[in-house]
């Protein structure tokens, strides 16, 4: 399991860059003199780059040494993140964020795809929970630290993050084992793995359910900083500190999620968690004070930490021989959802000037996603019953 903690570190730096824009968005909006709906494109550009290139990264990584792919991806991530720190304009920032997303698309799928290979089958969910905890830790520590660094200048968080990523790159190059494909013959086409996956009936349903969830999730998450700045008049460092409990909840949830799912069952835990998250997101703008908002942050992302590894487990169960492709597909769905969700949320927020329009949109998408996961669960039970009767 020691190797999993190395993945934890990679997910921490990638996650910090992914989530960093939420507390910085009000500051960068003023810096580049853009409206609320346009400011969301600094988040969407990263997500779009990731979503587009994740489709290529998965099949390629299934034919190459995953360590090599991860190192080159991380090198590109370091350069593009540094360039974000010197972006002279809104357009340049969006371009460099797009490049950072492209680079990250070649890193994180290697983590999700490698975990089932390097740990025992009984430890897969736990391993994914630890990797997910890296994302949660980036919210708990990376966001407030980024907010604190941004109190000096908005450039600083990007410079520090690229320096930390460089150190991690050197460590990975020295100690990370090579993970070569189990099948030595390369597939003739990048398209073929996706054709094979989508020939399975459950692939499209799982993909759509996850896309809807992440569209709703990032619609609200991306504008939390803007909302806290507008309604509670918090500074960028205060926004980062306010999000400390958000990351704490996510990390704790990801660490105990495997125990909860063992007791309640995977799909029961997943569906119940989505229902709770939807209710909490919807209620956020109506809480009367910041203390209750903080409590809502904790509970919402504690639940998210529990259910996210389960979603990854559902994805990885589709086709064990194409884990890299599946991991890229799931990440592409997440960042496509981020692009769509952030764009729609920016429009809703700008039009209504009320965060409740955004969280209401999130709640509706969670209900739709939950319905699809229920369909997947029922189909799986019917298939299990049919096999038992044969």
Swiss-Prot record:
The keyword Transmembrane helix is assigned to this record: yes
GO molecular function, one term: transmembrane transporter activity
Transmembrane domains' residue ranges: 4-24, 40-60, 68-88, 98-118, 130-150, 159-179, 205-225, 236-256, 273-293, 295-315, 329-349, 356-376
Location in the cell: Cell membrane
Ranges in a coiled coil: none
Gene Ontology CC annotations of this record: membrane; plasma membrane
Gene3D superfamilies: MFS general substrate transporter like domains (1.20.1250.20)
Pfam families referenced in this protein's UniProt entry, alphabetically: MFS_1 (PF07690)
PROSITE patterns referenced in this protein's UniProt entry, alphabetically: MFS
Record carries keyword Transmembrane: yes
Predominant subcellular localization, coarse grouping: membrane
Membrane topology (UniProt): Multi-pass membrane protein
InterPro entries: MFS, MFS_dom, MFS_Efflux_Transporters, MFS_trans_sf, Tet-R_TetA/multi-R_MdtG-like
Keywords in alphabetical order: Cell membrane, Membrane, Transmembrane, Transmembrane helix, Transport
CDD domains, per database record: MFS_NepI_like
PANTHER family tied to this protein: CHLORAMPHENICOL EFFLUX PUMP RV0191, PURINE EFFLUX PUMP PBUE
Record-stated family: Belongs to the major facilitator superfamily.
The name this protein goes by in its record: Uncharacterized MFS-type transporter YceJ
Gene name of the encoded protein: yceJ
């Amino acid at each position: 399991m020691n190797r999993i903690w190395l993945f934890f570190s990679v997910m921490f730096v990638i996650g910090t860059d992914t989530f960093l824009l939420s507390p910085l968005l009000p500051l960068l909006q003023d810096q580049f003199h853009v409206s609320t709906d346009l400011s969301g494109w600094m988040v969407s550009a990263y997500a779009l780059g990731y979503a587009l290139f994740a489709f290529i990264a998965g099949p390629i990584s299934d034919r190459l040494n995953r360590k090599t792919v991860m190192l080159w991806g991380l090198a590109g991530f370091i350069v593009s993140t540094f360039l974000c720190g010197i972006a002279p304009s809104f357009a340049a920032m969006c371009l460099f964020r797009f490049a950072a997303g492209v680079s990250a698309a070649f890193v994180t799928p290697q983590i999700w795809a490698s975990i089932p290979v390097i740990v025992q089958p009984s430890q897969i969910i736990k391993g994914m929970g630890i990797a997910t905890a890296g994302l949660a830790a980036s919210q708990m520590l990376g966001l407030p630290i980024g907010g604190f660094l941004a109190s000096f200048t908005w450039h600083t968080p990007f410079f520090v993050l690229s320096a930390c990523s460089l150190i991690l790159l050197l460590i990975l190059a020295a100690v990370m084992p090579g993970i070569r494909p189990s099948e030595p013959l390369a597939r003739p086409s990048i398209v073929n793995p996706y054709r094979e996956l989508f020939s399975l009936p459950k692939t499209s349903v799982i993909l759509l359910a996850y896309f809807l969830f992440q569209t709703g999730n990032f619609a609200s998450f991306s504008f939390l900083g803007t909302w806290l700045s507008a309604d509670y008049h918090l500074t960028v460092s205060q926004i980062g500190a306010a999000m400390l409990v958000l990351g704490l909840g996510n990390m704790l949830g990801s660490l105990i999620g495997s125990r909860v799912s063992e007791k309640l069952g995977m799909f029961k835990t997943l569906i119940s968690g989505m229902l709770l998250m939807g209710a909490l997101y919807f209620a956020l703008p109506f809480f009367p004070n910041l203390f209750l908002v903080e409590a809502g942050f904790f509970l919402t992302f504690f639940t998210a930490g529990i259910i996210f590894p389960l979603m990854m487990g559902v994805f990885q169960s589709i086709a064990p021989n194409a884990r890299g492709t599946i991991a890229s597909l799931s990440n592409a769905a997440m960042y496509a959802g981020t692009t769509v969700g952030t764009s729609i949320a920016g429009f809703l927020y700008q039009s209504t000037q009320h965060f409740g329009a955004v969280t209401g949109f999130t709640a509706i998408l969670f209900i739709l996603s939950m319905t699809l996961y229920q369909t997947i669960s029922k189909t799986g039970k019917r298939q299990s019953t049919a096999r038992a009767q044969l």
